[in-house]
Amino acid sequence: MLGPFEVLETIDMIQKENLDIRTITMGISLRDCCHPDIDISCKKIYDKITRYAEKLVVTGENIEREFGIPIINKRISVTPIALIAESSESDEYVKFAEAMDKAAQTVGVDFIGGFSSLVHKGYTVGDKRLIQSIPEALSRTKLVCSSVNVASTKAGINMDAVAEMGRIIKKCAELTADSGALACAKLVVFANAVEDNPFMAGAFHGIGEPECVINVGVSGPGVVKCALEKVKGADFGTVSETIKKTAFKITRMGQLVAQEASRRLNVPFGIVDLSLAPTPAIGDSVAYILEEMGLEKCGTHGTTAALALLNDAVKKGGVMASSYVGGLSGAFIPVSEDAGMIEAAMSGALSLEKLEAMTCVCSVGLDMIVVPGDTSAETISAIIADEAAIGVVNTKTTAVRIIPAPGKKVGDKVEFGGLLGSGPVMKVNPFSSSEFIKRGGRIPAPMHSLKN
């Protein structure tokens, strides 16, 4: 039985501590939309998305109003388009992105993900065509997000794809130079991508998923920070226990919203993603949680240990609160989307190398990193390769969302607006990785991938 304290605590979490549901994401299978005629295929995609997601936004708004729980985004993820487009006799894959964008705008969602390709072991003809079309697709659409999986623990790292993605990211930046290379903020390069991720820009509806599903992503870094303020000076066991209890409460709210949305839309409930997802709002920052543990500035020595504790405690608390936990489930460290990370990067406390170390112990990887516009494609590919290696060897999801901002140099700032925030341009290592990237081929899977 809930007492008055729990009710008031929840109200405080929402009104004062930035607790919210980051996203309700509807996953839709498009496997029945394949057709040799690209125009027919695109029409089938548009019709199916608008039919299934017709009431997604209004349902989210009704739940938000009735329960008093802020739901920031309503989103859609679809089957990786490379799998659908491959049956088409046309190579104009941008048309698929435009059909997705039109459908997303029709139903009123914030983003649609799934202009994606899975090439961790090699390319098909369709994969190559889709990857080549990413820059134009993202520059010509508003709501479409793209992802490419270039590595897995079972397959190793496809270095040909890694090299190609460096060039693709540079092209994305070039085509959207007038908006601070915004297309790059809608493109993620993965190792060990998951099939049920509700978060953008990396969401896609995996081939093992049902016809349609509801996945929910929670948020609430501000709630965790406020909880830690009450245990100042306590030992790490107390810190962990405090985070666990808070994560439990946050996840219960996510479970409630997911089940309610599932019931009202008559769509199966998939998972709750436990990830602490920051926003640019002051007080809604993962970096501030780490600083509350006793670090003067996020990025100093001890940051990786603090983040490991946070990530572990969030998982332990969250899994008790939901029957199905999935997605990425941890703590996100997107630099431009986190007020504390922005401050740390601008003060010099947080470097690209330190962020890479932090990705070893948290959810996903190098996220929303702005680098100088003259950063070479090979350097970007090498950054992706490093991050993929961390994911492959540690059997975890890692990713890179990097923005080489045209005309910008170290110390400048790029404004994206909204949840994407603003990013300080960070220094990259000036020495070349070009000859390494040119080798191509595939880095073999690690020994511990042989589980059978």
From Swiss-Prot:
Listed CDD domains: RNR_PFL_like_DUF711
Gene3D superfamilies: 3.20.70.20
Pfam families associated with the record: DUF711
Domain of life: Bacteria
HAMAP family: UPF0210
PANTHER family reported in the protein's UniProt record: UPF0210 PROTEIN MJ1665, UPF0210 PROTEIN SPR0218
Quaternary state and interactors: Homodimer.
Family: Belongs to the UPF0210 family.
NCBIfam families: PRK05313.1
Protein name: UPF0210 protein Ccel_1722
Species: Ruminiclostridium cellulolyticum (strain ATCC 35319 / DSM 5812 / JCM 6584 / H10) (Clostridium cellulolyticum)
